[in-house]
Swiss-Prot record:
Part of the 30S ribosomal subunit. Involved in the binding of tRNA to the ribosomes. The gene is rpsJ. This is Small ribosomal subunit protein uS10. Keywords: Ribonucleoprotein, Ribosomal protein. The lineage of its organism: Bacteria, Bacillati, Bacillota, Clostridia, Natranaerobiales. GO terms for biological process: translation. InterPro entries: Ribosomal_uS10, Ribosomal_uS10_CS, Ribosomal_uS10_dom, Ribosomal_uS10_dom_sf. HAMAP family: Ribosomal_uS10 (MF_00508). Belongs to the universal ribosomal protein uS10 family. GO terms for molecular function: structural constituent of ribosome; tRNA binding. One of its GO terms (cellular component) is ribonucleoprotein complex. Pfam families: Ribosomal_S10.
Length: 103
């Protein structure tokens, strides 16, 4: 059985709309160059909750909570061509999206 090449792309962002648009761009680019695409697969959202005291001096009972949600997507590109890799490197994505690529 031949060892097939695969590119795994993990996307992270705080805004899910920008994340979905970026994932759609990547999938469209990969399909246009002739590669098979699996995804985007939505991964569980991380939620960080920060509790701070509202008053600067006392009144510890009065607190405020803030949360930060990190949305994640996973895309697998199966059988990528050299044209696929080249076009993915040139792809222009928004600055709010963290991209992790594993070959």
């Amino acid at each position: 059985m031949a060892n097939k090449q695969k590119i795994r792309i993990r996307l992270k962002a705080f805004d899910h709309m920008i994340l979905d648009q970026s994932a759609e761009k990547i999938v469209e680019t990969a399909k246009r160059t002739g590669a098979n695409v699996s995804g985007p697969v939505p991964l569980p959202t991380d939620k960080n909750v920060y509790t701070v005291i509202r008053a600067p001096h006392k009144f510890k009972d009065s607190r405020e909570q803030f949360e930060m949600r990190t949305h994640k997507r996973l895309i697998d590109i199966l059988d990528p061509t050299s044209k696929t890799v080249d076009s993915l490197m040139r792809l222009d994505l928004p600055s709010g999206v963290d991209i992790e690529i594993k070959l």
